[in-house]
């Protein structure tokens, strides 16, 4: 989660310590319709550079720690809504680029309905971020193969990262799109996951939500249901290992990707 979606650094650290999972916290800001737009709009009335203020916040989270916790973020999260990037969202992208260039931190994005990932990529790379340091998140929100391959050829990672949320886009279409990308030779630039929230501001999940998307809140869903389907489609164990282990390792280590035809 970015800064304005209920991020809890101390809870994440505690979970990581007790489970052994390596949890990488994010800094960043969410899209205009659901994030902290009102606050930043208010700040803009005082003649300050909103991009600089945002970038300073991201850099502090990455280099000094989140608030007074001493826990540092390790990635920048940005977002845009469907079919357009608003001025506010553009400012977030510019601030993220500035912070990434200053610190070397990678960036992951939120997209809606499989749109605007190419525009996000262009804004970030035009402002100095190497393409291989970017994940275009929720790329699995569309089955547009040319959109996927355009992002891949431009050197960024595709986030097929919403498995289990069939009400947004069905898993079978996600699987089909992922298989096409893998068979097109772009399997080294795909990362996979669920898009799950594990703590709802300290309260139980609303029962109605759980009933609608039970797989979204099952951390074994990808292993139990998606991997077998990938195998049925001819995806090898080596390719699956790449999705789960090698690609995330390469992304966070900053290794460059080879050119894609």
Residue ranges and their predicted role:
Residues 1-38, 158, 227, 251-261:
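N-terminal hydrophobic targeting/anchoring segments and the immediately downstream early-domain regions
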Residues 1-3, 28-32, 81, 112-114, ...:
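Active-site beta-loop-alpha junctions enriched in small/polar residues
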Residues 10-14, 18, 57-60, 64, ...:
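Alpha-helical scaffolding segments of alpha/beta enzyme cores, especially the outer helices
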Residues 29, 100, 158, 195, ...:
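Divalent metal-coordination and catalytic microenvironments
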Residues 102-174, 208-220, 227, 232-236:
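Active-site core of metal-dependent hydrolases
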Residues 161-162, 186-210, 240:
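Short acidic/histidine-rich active-site segments
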Residues 217-261:
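Mid-to-C-terminal alpha-helical segments outside catalytic/metal-binding sites
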């Amino acid at each position: 989660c970015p800064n304005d979606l209920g991020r809890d650094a101390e809870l994440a650290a505690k979970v990581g310590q007790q489970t052994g999972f390596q949890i990488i916290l994010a800094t960043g800001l969410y899209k205009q319709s659901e994030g902290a737009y009102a606050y930043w709009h208010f700040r803009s009335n005082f003649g300050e550079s909103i991009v600089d203020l945002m970038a300073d916040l991201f850099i502090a989270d990455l280099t000094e720690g989140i608030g007074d916790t001493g826990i540092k973020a390790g990635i920048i999260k940005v977002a845009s809504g469907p079919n357009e990037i608003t001025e506010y969202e553009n400012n977030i992208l510019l601030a993220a680029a500035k912070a990434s260039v200053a610190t070397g931190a990678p960036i992951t994005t939120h997209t809606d309905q499989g749109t605007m990932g190419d525009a996000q990529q262009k804004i970030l790379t035009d402002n100095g971020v190497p393409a291989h340091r970017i994940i275009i998140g929720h790329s699995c929100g569309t089955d547009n193969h040319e959109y996927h391959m355009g992002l891949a050829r431009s050197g960024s990672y595709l986030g097929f990262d919403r498995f289990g949320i069939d009400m947004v886009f069905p898993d079978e279409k996600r699987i089909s799109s992922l298989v096409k990308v893998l068979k097109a030779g772009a399997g080294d630039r795909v990362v996979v996951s669920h898009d799950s929230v594990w703590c709802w501001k300290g309260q139980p999940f609303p029962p109605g939500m759980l009933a609608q998307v039970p797989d979204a809140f099952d951390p074994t869903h990808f292993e139990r249901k998606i991997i077998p389907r990938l195998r049925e489609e001819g995806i090898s164990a080596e390719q699956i290992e790449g999705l789960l282990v090698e690609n995330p390792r390469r992304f966070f280590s900053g290794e460059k990707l080879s050119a894609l035809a």
